[in-house]
């Protein structure tokens, strides 16, 4: 059976949180354990440089790579089933990114909304947009097509990136002959989780995240401060359940559905205190996180396991990358010149 290749991953900007679990990790585990798919998970450290260029930020990337690795392995990403690789360790990505940049009209890139959103989140004004940030979607296309991925799991906010990738693949194949598959978008049921402050999706930069590695007391404290219904000033005031982060989290992480429905009824009637509902949520989230925390501590204590997992996956991706670039060189006609140069230098 020919497996469909899947490519997805994370920028190493720090530890992963419940938003990552809901938005991507659950889906990745399903794909990894499905025999129809061959999964490649990229730690996209080059992409981190598009918005984090200060020396102190760059110096943290190395430790963040191991944070992501430890989190991935602790939740069940298996290096025996999936290739986990480091983007910057694949030399071919730099060349393919350059070649694709020659084929991509600037207006196609500037029409992608996520570029300006990334700039806003990083407090970068439009006049200061770097070439690397503007070209971020082209580098992402190079990641996808270098791996010859058939499927790319993304949320709606990143669909335009995959559409650009399809356009680049079509353009290259039309001009130079067929090399690249045109990847399809693969969407999960949920793509984001509201932050604990009720303001937008959970993220490190917004300081509204519960991390997979947070200890029990930290989880309790974050949930104690969680945003609920601002109009509910007393426990006897009927509260709003819909859109309330407290109940969104209960629906996702409390497996006792009858209890959750009872909480909702009492909350709407003004017959229960926020503190009681929050305490139960903290209990359930801590029960949910306990296995991850235990496994993570084991991996952190044995960093060689993390290093071996990354090396194994990176070597697999290097092999794929070499094969892809050999096809690219052949179709472009560059390989003939390079071979003659190599032959004359011997």
From Swiss-Prot:
Its EC number is 6.1.1.2. A motif ('KMSKS' region) lies at residues 201-205. Keywords: Aminoacyl-tRNA synthetase, ATP-binding, Cytoplasm, Ligase, Nucleotide-binding, Protein biosynthesis. A motif ('HIGH' region) lies at residues 12-20. One of its GO terms (biological process) is tryptophanyl-tRNA aminoacylation. ATP binds at residues 11-13, 19-20, 155-157, 193, 201-205. It comes from the Bacteria. GO terms for cellular component: cytosol. It holds the Pfam family tRNA-synt_1b. The keyword DNA repair does not apply. Catalyzes the attachment of tryptophan to tRNA(Trp). Belongs to the class-I aminoacyl-tRNA synthetase family. Homodimer. This is Tryptophan--tRNA ligase. It comes from Chlamydia muridarum (strain MoPn / Nigg). The lineage of its organism: Bacteria, Pseudomonadati, Chlamydiota, Chlamydiia, Chlamydiales.
């Amino acid at each position: 059976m020919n497996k469909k290749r899947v490519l997805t991953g994370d920028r190493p900007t720090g530890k992963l949180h419940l938003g990552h679990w809901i938005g991507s990790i659950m889906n990745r585990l399903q794909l990894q354990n499905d025999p129809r798919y061959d999964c490649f998970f990229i730690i996209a450290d080059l992409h981190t440089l598009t918005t984090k260029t200060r020396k102190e930020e760059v110096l943290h990337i190395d430790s963040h790579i191991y944070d992501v690795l430890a989190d991935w392995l602790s939740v069940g990403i298996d290096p025996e089933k999936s290739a986990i690789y480091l983007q910057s360790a694949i030399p071919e990505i730099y060349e393919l990114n350059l070649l694709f940049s020659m084929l991509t009209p600037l207006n196609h890139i500037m029409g992608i909304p996520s570029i300006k959103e990334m700039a806003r989140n990083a407090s970068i004004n439009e006049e200061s947009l770097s070439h690397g940030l503007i070209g971020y979607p082209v580098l992402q296309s190079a990641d996808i097509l270098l791996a010859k991925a058939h499927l790319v799991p993304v949320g709606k906010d990143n669909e335009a990136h995959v559409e650009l990738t399809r356009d680049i693949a079509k353009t290259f194949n039309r001009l130079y002959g067929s090399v690249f598959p045109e990847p399809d978008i693969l969407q999960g049921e949920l793509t984001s989780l509201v932050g604990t402050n009720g303001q937008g999706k959970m993220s490190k930069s917004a300081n509204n995240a519960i991390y997979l590695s947070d200890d029990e007391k930290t989880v309790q404290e974050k949930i104690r401060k969680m945003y609920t219904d601002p109009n509910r000033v007393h426990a006897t005031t009927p509260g709003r359940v819909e859109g309330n982060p407290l109940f969104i989290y209960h629906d996702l992480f409390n497996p006792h559905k009858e209890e959750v429905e009872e909480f909702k009824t009492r909350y709407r009637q003004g017959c229960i205190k926020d503190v009681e509902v929050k305490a139960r949520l903290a209990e359930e989230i801590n029960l949910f996180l306990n296995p991850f925390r235990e496994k993570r501590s084991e991996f952190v204590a044995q960093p060689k396991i993390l290093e071996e997992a990354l090396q194994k996956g990176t070597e697999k991706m290097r092999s794929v990358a070499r094969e892809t670039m050999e096809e690219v060189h052949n179709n472009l006609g560059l390989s003939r010149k390079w071979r003659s140069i190599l032959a004359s230098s011997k």
